[in-house]
Structures are given as C-alpha cells and as structure tokens.
Design a protein with these regions (language model features):
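Hydrophobic alpha-helical transmembrane segments of multi-pass membrane proteins
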Residues: 3, 48-59, 89-90, 143-150, ...
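Central hydrophobic cores of alpha-helical transmembrane segments in multi-pass inner-membrane proteins
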Residues: 6-15, 91-96
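Transmembrane-helix boundary/entry motifs in multi-pass membrane transporters
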Residues: 15-59, 73-80, 209-225
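Membrane-water interface regions at transmembrane-helix termini and the short interhelical loops
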Residues: 67-74, 88-109, 165
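Helix-loop-helix junctions that connect adjacent transmembrane segments
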Residues: 81-86, 104-211
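Hydrophobic core segments of alpha-helical transmembrane domains in multi-pass membrane transport
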Residues: 90-95, 114-121, 228
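Oxyanion-binding "anion nests"
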Residues: 206-244
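Single conserved hydrophobic/aromatic residue that forms the stacking wall/gate
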Residues: 242-245, 249-252
C-alpha cells in the first residue's frame, strides 16, 4: 500500500510540476489561470480557488497548533490553552524573519529531524521489541493506511518551489520528485515501524512518537518531543510561506 501511495503521489505531483513548468514556475492558483480559467469568469474562479486553498491551509494550521501545544503539555504540564498560545508565538516568528530565512532554517531542520529518527531507531532496537500482530484484513484499514501515507508525503507546494529553484530543468525536477517522495515514504515506514515495535502498552497519545520516547527513556522522550516540535514548526512555516506567496501573485 505504501508503494501504491508513492506511485500515486509521484504521478499527481508530476502533473503539478508540469502545470507550474508550463506557466513559468508560478504558484498553483496562477497555474490554473494559465491552463483552466479563461474569459470573464477568470478572476472569480481564481479568487474562489484561492479562498478554498487558503481555508484548507488555515484548517491545517489550526490542527498544527493543537499538535504543537500537546508537546508543551507533555513537557511542562501546562494548561492546553496556554500551550497553544506559546506554540503560536514561537511559530509566528516566521512572519518576522522572512521567507528566505525560513527556507534556510527548514534545510537545517530536516537534517536535525533525520538525525533524531536515526538515533530513535537505534534506541528502539536496543530495547526489547514488541511482536507485530497481524490484524484481520479489512478494506477500511487499507484505505486508512493509504490516506495516512498520501497525507504524510504530500508536498504540492514544495514541488512548485523545486520547479523555480531548479530553473525549469525538467530532468532534475523529475529526479527530485522521485527521490523526495521515496525518502518521505521510507521515513513513514521507519517512524511507524519503530513506534509499533518499541512502544510499551497501548498507543493512547495523539503524538505516538513521544509515547515511543517514553518507552525508551527520558532522553528519548525529549528527542521525540524535539522531533515533533520541529516537524510541526516546519509544516507551519511552509503553510504560511505558501499562502503568502499566493497572496503576492494575486496582488493582495
């Protein structure tokens, strides 16, 4: 199922990359303007897509804030509302440092995340492992796994940035998409596998990686929290920068 999700994601993001490539590396809404929207209704359709896209990002960001707040609750035992405010203040720094600095920070954040996953994986296998139980086959479980993998590895706006960053080099764009989604899928398998193998007791927390950390030791719980925090902050900053980019191209 992970392989199917990988193939579907690659095909969909190849289409997005081609749309952006054919329209000079512009954002998604502008690509729709160049390929789909014409005539008197062009602006109405463009604004409609932007509004829907913006709402989707805002809903995602709200969930992101709740996830980030949960980390502070686990770390400091603070009230959830206060944790939400604290996370929002930290994440809001992106507004002040600018999109270029955000891009540079994301590069190093990804390196940190890869290092944490490597350490957590080693730590998992240094402790007694759970036996993987085989659940009864059901289509709903299969579809849930597919949806999770597709959601976790989706990167439609990152593909557009690849088109711009590689100056329209089609060969390198294709290679980046294949390799990028391959790495993302491997990460999903590693993180999911270590959580299932190393977590003691039933999975009860929303942030399963932190529960894995608790099962390994205090140091691992801290690392898992840092991993979750960095991952959520990266997602938050990406959501903001891409929404801001769409505002710019629409002259808002």
């Amino acid at each position: 199922m992970v392989l199917i999700a990988y193939c579907v994601n690659v095909i969909l993001h190849m289409i997005i990359a081609e749309l952006s490539y054919n329209n000079g590396g512009v954002q998604l809404v502008k690509s729709f303007e160049g390929e789909l929207f014409h005539g008197k209704m062009k602006q109405i359709f463009s604004w409609s897509v932007f509004i829907v896209y913006g709402l989707a990002i805002m809903i995602g960001v709200s969930g992101n804030i709740n996830g980030g707040a949960q980390i502070f609750v686990n770390w400091f035992g603070m009230p959830f509302v206060a944790a939400q405010v604290l996370y929002y203040v930290i994440a809001g720094v992106v507004v002040f440092i600018g999109m270029k600095a955000v891009g540079i920070a994301q590069k190093y954040a990804v390196i940190v995340l890869m290092g944490i996953v490597a350490v957590m994986t080693v730590g998992t296998f240094l402790h007694p492992l759970n036996s993987l139980q085989r659940a009864e086959f059901h289509w709903n479980n299969l579809l849930a796994l597919y949806s999770m993998v597709v959601f976790a590895t989706s990167a439609n706006q990152a593909v557009i940035q690849v088109v711009k960053g590689l100056d329209g080099n089609a060969k390198q764009i294709r290679r980046s998409i294949f390799i990028g989604f391959g790495l993302s899928s491997v990460f999903v398998l590693i993180v999911t596998g270590t959580v299932l193998l190393g977590t003691k007791g039933a999975l009860e927390k929303e942030l399963a990686y932190m529960q894995l950390g608790e099962s390994i030791g205090t140091w691992a719980m801290i690392l898992a929290g840092v991993f979750s925090l960095f991952a959520l902050l990266t997602t938050f900053s990406v959501s903001y920068t891409h929404l801001r980019a769409h505002e710019t191209v629409l002259d808002l």
